[in-house]
């Protein structure tokens, strides 16, 4: 593979960002970008810097589905964000089911002894790591 993939956990106020290693085996946290989706501030200026730095071949966005698998308004917003991202940067965009990733991320932080105040700073980028790692695991090269 030898190319990185960015993972994004897109919310209404923040975008958690993660990146894969060059082999596409592991995901690492990068940062959390503050956005204001209602005002149309999608964090693309900061993403442009990260895309230039990491040179990903693809971006994976979390797709928030209902527990029964249906897609609702948040999934529609995620797909809209992905379309805008693809149009702006010319990158392939893929989607990964993100059900329970925020809950998983919170559990990891709690189990790690991270204080509530500090969890808020890390939860979105950790959710982005889980989204990207789930994608990498599902699309791993079979050796």
Swiss-Prot record:
Protein's GO biological process: rRNA 5'-end processing
Gene Ontology molecular function terms on file: nuclease activity
Keyword check for Hydrolase: yes
Pfam families per record: RuvX (PF03652)
Location(s) in or outside the cell: Cytoplasm
Keywords from the named record: Cytoplasm, Hydrolase, Nuclease, Ribosome biogenesis
Enzyme's top EC category: hydrolase
Gene Ontology CC: cytosol
Enzyme Commission numbers on file: 3.1.-.-
Record flagged with keyword Cytoplasm: yes
Function statement: Could be a nuclease involved in processing of the 5'-end of pre-16S rRNA.
Family: Belongs to the YqgF nuclease family.
NCBIfam families assigned to the protein according to its UniProt record, in alphabetical order: RNAse_H_YqgF (TIGR00250)
UniProt-recorded name of the protein: Putative pre-16S rRNA nuclease
Organism lineage string: Bacteria, Bacillati, Bacillota, Bacilli, Lactobacillales
């Amino acid at each position: 593979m030898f190319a990185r993939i960015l993972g994004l956990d897109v919310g209404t106020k923040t975008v958690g960002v993660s990146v894969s290693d060059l082999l596409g085996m592991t995901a690492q946290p990068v940062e959390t970008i503050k956005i204001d989706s209602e005002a149309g501030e999608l964090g693309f200026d900061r993403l442009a810097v990260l895309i230039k730095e990491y040179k990903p071949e693809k971006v994976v966005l979390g797709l928030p589905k209902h527990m029964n698998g249906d897609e609702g308004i948040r999934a529609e917003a995620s797909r809209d964000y992905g379309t805008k991202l693809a149009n702006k940067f010319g990158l392939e965009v893929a989607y990964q089911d993100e059900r329970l990733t925020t809950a998983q991320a919170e559990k990891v932080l709690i189990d790690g002894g991270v204080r509530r105040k500090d969890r808020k700073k890390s939860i979105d980028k950790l959710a982005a790591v889980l989204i990207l790692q789930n994608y990498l695991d599902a699309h791993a090269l079979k050796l």
